[in-house]
Amino acid sequence: MPCCDPYPWIGLNVGRLSSFPLLKYPQVRRWLAPFIVACSLYFLLWIPEDQPSWVSALVKCQPILCLVLFLWAVAPGGSYTWLLQGALTCSAVGDACLIWPEAFFYGMAVFSVAHLLYLWAFGLSPLQPGLLLCTTLASLTYYSFLLLHLEPNMVLPVAAYGLILNTMLWRGLVLGRSAGWGAVLFIFSDGVLAWDTFVYTLPFARLVTMSTYYAAQLLLTLSALRSPGLKTH
């Protein structure tokens, strides 16, 4: 009988712990449990998007807030961890804003701050301008189609957000490992959301967007544990 996967968001089961060494630490598994439960609650409840409320906002934000708690409990201190906590907190606020269509601009602004904090954490060394050229060409190809479908008042904010997001992707890829994969999933999630919102309604768009978004935030969070020195309790 196949083994039940207790950590579906990172593709891990108890028979494959060696594929993600960090999960060998009991405190990592213990403090990831609230995130797994919160994600499961979001997808099980699946509150309709046309019924915005503070309850739906809380359910949507809970997994991200659990990651803030995870970093506080497990990650070593330092500017990298603090910047990630700030980025996650901004992301949770952005998630809440996006529940209400009239708060879309506020949500985009707060997510821009989150990406800037991720960018600050990742740093600018080594530079690797060739990688920046590749990500920029890919982003320009996507946004050249997307911007054609936007209202005039949306063009500048979306273009600015795309620039920040592309820069975060570049630095995440330079850092590599879970930060790189997290950045890729984040830009994929945002790309699906934007296309579904502004261009063409996609099947299962919300499921794809939210599953990749939560996975992206988890991977970005785990990048804080890339160096030894987990907290002990």
From Swiss-Prot:
The chain crosses the membrane at residues 31-47, 54-75, 82-100, 107-124, 131-147, 154-170, 179-195, 207-225. Competitively inhibited by lysophosphatidic acid. GO terms for biological process: ether lipid metabolic process. Optimum pH is 7.0 with both ethanolamine and choline as substrates. Fifty percent of maximal velocity occurs at pH 5.5 and pH 8. Residues 48-53, 101-106, 148-153, 196-206 are extracellular. Keywords: Cytoplasm, Endoplasmic reticulum, Hydrolase, Lipid metabolism, Membrane, Transmembrane, Transmembrane helix. GO terms for cellular component: cytoplasm; endoplasmic reticulum membrane; membrane. Residues 1-30, 76-81, 125-130, 171-178, 226-233 are cytoplasmic. InterPro entries: TMEM86B-like. Homodimer. Belongs to the TMEM86 family. Catalyzes the hydrolysis of the vinyl ether bond of choline or ethanolamine lysoplasmalogens, forming fatty aldehyde and glycerophosphocholine or glycerophosphoethanolamine, respectively and is specific for the sn-2-deacylated (lyso) form of plasmalogen. This is Lysoplasmalogenase TMEM86B.
